[in-house]
Amino acid sequence: MGEEYEKLVEILTVATDDNFILDSSRSYFDCTNYYFEIDKESTFQKRGPSKENRRDPIVGMGLLLDAQMLPVGMKIFPGNESEKPVMRDLIHDLKSRNNIKGRTIQIADKGLNCAKNSIEAIDNGDGYLFSKSVKTLPERERQWVLLDDGFETVFQSERRTRL
C-alpha cells in the first residue's frame, strides 16, 4: 500500500457503504501500535514507546468505526509520535473526511488517557471510555471498583458478561 494507503482506504470505505450502508449516527475511535521486526526505520516505522517495551520500529494507527462497528476510516502515523495530541487531529480528520456528524466514543488505554482528550471529547459532544489500572487507584476508589453490586449480568450464548 505504501504512501497511497489513504486512497485504498477511501475506496474500501465507499465499497463498504455501497454494500452495507454505514451508520454514522454514532462512531467509535481507537488507536493502537504495531511493531516490525526490522532493523531500519522508515517514514512511518519509527522507534517509539511500546507497551511491550520492545525496541523495534512501530507504527501508530487510528481507526474509526461506525455504529455497527464497520470500519469507516483509518490513518497511520509515525510510531515515535505521542498518540495524545495525534488522537484529537485523527478524530477530527476522519470525521470530516467521512462526513460523520454523530457522536464519537473515544476508546483509550492509559496511553491516551489525559485531561486534554477528555475535555475535547466533552466539548465536541462526544464521549469517551478510558481505562485506568485498578492497581494504581487510591484505596477508596479500588474498593468501589471491585464491589460486586451495580452490575447487570448479560448472557450471550455460552459467554457471561458483567456490565
Which positions does each model-derived feature cover?
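Anion-binding and metal-coordination hotspots
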Residues: 1-163
